[in-house]
């Protein structure tokens, strides 16, 4: 009897052990599946984060490409505008005539300093205007200005006598230079800081450029194009034109047909007007 009881207890104990082992085995099999689900979820989250980062980087790259295109577009527009509007202009002739009587390096440095200051002021004014007036209105104003200057230049090219007008303009500039010879008070005040020749070149160039069509066109360009591109392009254009004027002197100015320059400039300004009208900034 005692042996039967002990045998029964032993069987019950074995059954309990077997049940516990089976439960443990089942738990071990469920854990990997749960871990796999968690791992898959973590992998999905990482994949989404990677895709989001990749899209963001692609968007940033696209934005940089657009900014680069805007910079080069403004640069070439400003450069071409200055080249066709400044060759043979009053500032061009001033630099050419002064270089015939004074050291070329001094005349060039004074004229370029004035033109750089004028370009920075014009570009800054062009960036301030859109903050005061809506971008749509500034673009419309720029379109009208481009068309006005283009038609005006074409009218000048059609009506003017190239040789007579060029000779008259040179005589007017010579009169201004001769009139400025007697005014030495301004020179004496600043003689400690700048040489009289540098100062004369700077002041004459600055006053001749103020209100000129190239300054107004620079302001108009800066209202709807990249300001850095406009400033760099205009500065490079002024540097090229003024360098030609200083090196070539009046000989180069007298051989360039003002009618041809006015025609090219008029067509270019009309092209700017059409581009601004049909492709306005966003």
From Swiss-Prot:
TM regions (residue ranges): 67-87, 106-126, 138-158, 189-209, 227-247, 259-279
Which GO BP annotation is one of this protein's?
Golgi calcium ion transport
- Keyword annotations: Membrane, Signal, Transmembrane, Transmembrane helix
Matching InterPro entries, A to Z? GDT1-like (IPR001727)
Identify the main location: membrane
A GO MF label: manganese ion transmembrane transporter activity
**Residues annotated as signal peptide:** 1-26
Q: Where in the cell is it found?
A: Membrane
Question: How is this protein annotated for GO cellular component?
Answer: Golgi apparatus; membrane
Write down a Pfam family by its short name: GDT1
What does the record say about its membrane topology? Multi-pass membrane protein
Which family is this sequence assigned to?
Answer: Belongs to the GDT1 family.
Identify this protein by name. GDT1-like protein 4
Lineage here is: Eukaryota, Viridiplantae, Streptophyta, Embryophyta, Tracheophyta
